[in-house]
């Protein structure tokens, strides 16, 4: 299977676009680390059906991301935040409370 972390992030971004069953299966597999057999048993279906659903949903999530580009936007925001924090940390004259406040506000912007 693909990069688990990447798919997990795509589930976070686009999970609401999946059906309830698709979302549940993807969450069980990628976030809860259940095996195909365990998920098949829970859903009263075959291991192959779960495998096919996961592959299909992975492609679907990648397709959403190619169109909406949320992961690239979030990555860019984190890079900008890190650059800003590095510049702030170079300036030792700034109060630590101010640095912490700026860091928190940047985090809010990223997660908005």
Curated annotation (Swiss-Prot):
Gene3D superfamilies: Winged helix-like DNA-binding domain superfamily/Winged helix DNA-binding domain. Transmembrane segments: none annotated. Belongs to the UPF0122 family. Might take part in the signal recognition particle (SRP) pathway. This is inferred from the conservation of its genetic proximity to ftsY/ffh. May be a regulatory protein. This is UPF0122 protein CPR_1686.
